[in-house]
A protein has these predicted regions:
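Extracellular and organelle-lumenal recognition/adhesion modules and their flexible linkers in secreted
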Residues: 1-225
């Protein structure tokens, strides 16, 4: 007698582990669901590892489709602004940040059009990682062509690479500057209200508010409701 047993082929299982190396980030990684851009942060546990004890927090929806590809066609140059993949270490230890040039005008840089994604009267938080390049003053804006002043945040880069808020050119409900690791990166962001959505809306990165074509390093743009 012959006994036949069905063999079930199992799909390969991929696994990896993460361990914190120095004070590089307040969380281990971000997970994004491609179908709707929902994101969550996975935190390190008490042993600076990712484990079953790690918490997942701040699940949100990033309204920016290409938040980490600043040279994607979704992002356009303004007044000669450009975004070039850089070779420096990004906030998570890779080489995925961009050197953004401001071009010839104070508002030069890059922008991503998000028309139709905002609701008038609602609050939104726009943030990204920035690191000092050659510029001494940079600005990020939640822009609407029919609204002035737009929700925005301007920082002055000190000679040691530490940014400080320029309150004279900031219009926001709240602002935040958070030091990330020890390599010059800061998470910079603000919360503002979409006062008008009848025009064209976009998020901007304006590296050089002095209009001299200087640069800032940028990574991981995020727009949350």
């Amino acid at each position: 007698n012959v006994s036949v047993k069905e063999a079930i082929k199992q799909a390969p299982v991929a696994a990896f582990s993460l361990r914190k190396l120095g004070d590089v980030s307040p969380y281990a990684c971000r997970i994004r669901r491609s179908s709707d851009n929902t994101e969550a942060q996975v935190m390190f546990d008490a042993s600076d590892r990712v484990s079953e004890q790690s918490t997942v927090r701040n699940t949100s929806q990033n309204l920016i489709d290409f938040s980490e590809q600043l040279d994607n066609s979704a992002w356009s140059g303004n007044q000669g602004g450009t975004a070039t993949l850089s070779a420096i270490t990004d906030p998570f230890g890779g080489t995925n940040s961009y050197e953004v040039s401001g071009g010839s005008q104070t508002y030069g840089g890059i922008y991503d059009t998000i028309t139709g994604l905002l609701t008038e009267g609602k609050s939104y938080t726009y943030s990204l990682y920035l690191k000092k390049g050659t510029s001494t003053k940079s600005r990020i804006v939640l822009y609407d062509s029919d609204n002035d002043p737009d929700p925005r945040m301007t920082v002055i880069w000190n000679s040691d690479g530490v940014p400080s808020l320029d309150s004279s050119d900031t219009h926001a409900i709240a602002t935040k500057i958070e030091k990330i690791g020890d390599d010059g990166w800061y998470r910079i962001g603000f919360t503002g209200v979409a006062l008008n959505t009848s025009g064209v809306q976009s998020v901007t990165i304006e590296p050089d508010r002095n209009g001299t074509g200087k640069t800032v390093y940028a990574f991981g743009a995020m727009l949350e409701e």
